[in-house]
Swiss-Prot record:
<keyword id="KW-0067">ATP-binding</keyword>
<comment type="pathway">
    <text>Cell wall biogenesis; peptidoglycan biosynthesis.</text>
</comment>
<dbReference type="GO" id="GO:0009252">
    <property type="term" value="P:peptidoglycan biosynthetic process"/>
</dbReference>
<keyword id="KW-0132">Cell division</keyword>
<keyword id="KW-0573">Peptidoglycan synthesis</keyword>
<dbReference type="Pfam" id="PF08245">
    <property type="entry name" value="Mur_ligase_M"/>
</dbReference>
<keyword id="KW-0963">Cytoplasm</keyword>
<dbReference type="GO" id="GO:0071555">
    <property type="term" value="P:cell wall organization"/>
</dbReference>
<dbReference type="GO" id="GO:0008360">
    <property type="term" value="P:regulation of cell shape"/>
</dbReference>
<feature type="binding site">
    <location>
        <begin position="130"/>
        <end position="136"/>
    </location>
    <ligand>
        <name>ATP</name>
    </ligand>
</feature>
<comment type="similarity">
    <text>Belongs to the MurCDEF family.</text>
</comment>
<keyword id="KW-0131">Cell cycle</keyword>
<comment type="function">
    <text>Cell wall formation. Catalyzes the addition of glutamate to the nucleotide precursor UDP-N-acetylmuramoyl-L-alanine (UMA).</text>
</comment>
<keyword id="KW-0436">Ligase</keyword>
<dbReference type="InterPro" id="IPR036565">
    <property type="entry name" value="Mur-like_cat_sf"/>
</dbReference>
<keyword id="KW-0547">Nucleotide-binding</keyword>
<dbReference type="GO" id="GO:0008764">
    <property type="term" value="F:UDP-N-acetylmuramoylalanine-D-glutamate ligase activity"/>
</dbReference>
Length: 447
């Protein structure tokens, strides 16, 4: 018999920040902007720190002037952080890089934007973290909860910062029945008050080792999601994490999931997505979602862009955009999703991982590998004797090389296992480039 999670946040924590406290926000992206607006709303004195003034949009500059933010641009210095009571680094800004500039005799309270906002909410929280599949899983959770008639806020590391939701509710918008939050290791590292009624860890493997000091620090950050849970809360974890759950002394009730095909009517590909669906179901039934409601949501759920996205099938060749694949494990899951020969496009800014462990999977599924961008030597060192490989400076040339080899029944799969920052601004831009190449190749064949 599963437990329906009670509504535990009757009132938000009193005085989330002290009125007049000096709050320093590092970064002016969407998360930093939302944190600054919320801090101002709560009565803090807001200071903005940004190393690169060219990143500051005209819209933010206008907001800062209107609300009276103290903006300090340029290379970090002790002066920028002097007198700070609160420090909110934007996701992706390593806290360690800021420590040399802080007053050790009077250190500020360091908190993530999502942690700040969590102090202000009354609705129960369903939070999801993991190395890969977070966005698909939280989107599935939102779909299942909505199928059950619940009002849902979906945000955090995906799309809308939680601070924007808090401000909208303060302005009169109806609160959500459930807050569904995607939470990254960057955010969790500075979370001290976030307590989800349901916390989900879908998987964990080497990632962001260009940010975290080592795998242990990354693991510690992920398990902070469960740190404040109590026995009335629910922790949902992948099977095989039982020992980790014991090591981190999880206090919540635990449920473990496998990649079972409980909901067979779905457009999602791969066993990893079956695991994502099962994790979402275990999380959502705690809020009263029935299996039939979940099944309806899964059947209607469209695969998300850049995540094993079927772009087109031309002359019997299937083109799949998995640009969001930035880890070795996500590439493995992508390759195992097909029983057809795969022409694999990969490469980019290396984030860590064990490519040698993929040799059996590459042998079984990959017909050829087309590398592009950075990390050439890392891939070649691991796979040079395993599969035919080529390397090109850019995706377009590598794409042309793979399509020249493609035959009916093949799959041209871009699953890079790396970040995109060597050639692109983000994974979405990389995925868009792949899709443009597919469209151009199709148009040439139609001529």
């Amino acid at each position: 018999m599963h437990t329906v999670i009670p509504h535990t946040h009757d009132t938000p924590a009193a005085a989330p920040v002290r009125s007049g406290a000096v709050a320093v926000v590092v970064g002016t992206g969407r998360s930093g902007t939302a944190a600054a607006r919320l801090l101002h709303h709560l009565g803090a004195s807001v200071r903005i720190v940004e190393k690169d003034e060219s990143r500051v949009s005209a819209e933010f500059a206008s907001l800062a002037a209107r609300l009276g933010f103290d903006c300090r641009y340029g290379s970090h210095s002790a002066e920028q952080f002097a007198g700070a009571d609160i420090l909110v680094p934007s996701p992706g800004v390593p806290v360690a890089s800021l420590l040399p500039y802080l007053d050790a005799s009077r250190p500020p309270e360091i908190m993530a934007e999502i942690d700040l906002a969590a102090r202000c909410v009354t609705s129960p929280v369903l939070a999801v973290t993991g190395t890969s599949g977070k966005t698909t899983t939280v989107s599935l959770c939102a779909a299942m909860l909505r199928a059950a008639g619940k009002r849902v806020f979906l945000g955090g590391n995906i799309g809308t910062p939680l601070s924007e939701y808090v401000l909208d509710v303060a302005a009169g918008e109806a609160p959500a029945d459930v807050l569904v939050l995607e939470v990254s290791s960057f955010q969790l590292q500075t979370c001290t008050t976030l307590r989800p009624e349901v916390a989900v860890l879908i998987n964990i493997s080497a990632n962001h080792l260009d940010y975290h000091a080592d795998m242990q620090e990354y693991l510690d950050a992920k398990f902070r999601l469960f740190a404040l849970q109590g026995p009335d809360d629910l922790a949902v974890l992948q099977s095989g994490m039982e020992e980790l759950a014991d090591r981190y002394a999880l206090a919540a009730r635990r449920e473990f999931f496998d990649a079972v095909r409980r909901f067979p009517r779905t457009a999602l590909l791969g066993s990893h997505n079956m695991a994502n669906i099962e994790a979402a179901w275990l999380a959502c039934r705690a809020f009263g979602v029935t299996q039939s409601q979940a099944a309806q949501a899964v059947e209607e759920f469209a695969p998300l862009e850049h995540r094993l996205e079927k772009v087109d099938e031309v002359a019997g060749v299937l083109f799949v955009n998995d640009s969001k694949s930035t880890t070795v494990d996500s590439m493995k899951a992508a390759l195992e999703s097909f029983d057809r020969p795969v022409l694999l496009l990969c490469g980019g800014k290396w984030k860590g991982g064990d490519l040698v462990s993929l040799i059996p999977v590459v042998r079984r599924h990959a017909k050829a590998v087309g590398l592009f961008g950075a990390s050439r030597e890392i891939f070649e060192h691991a796979w040079a004797d395993v599969v035919p490989m080529s390397w090109d400076h850019d995706l377009q040339t590598a794409f042309r090389r793979m399509t020249a080899m493609a035959q009916p029944g093949d799959v041209v799969l871009m699953s890079p296992a790396t970040s995109s920052y060597d050639l692109y601004s983000n994974y979405k831009e990389r995925g868009g480039d792949f899709k443009r190449n597919v469209a151009a190749w199709k148009a040439e064949r139609d001529d």
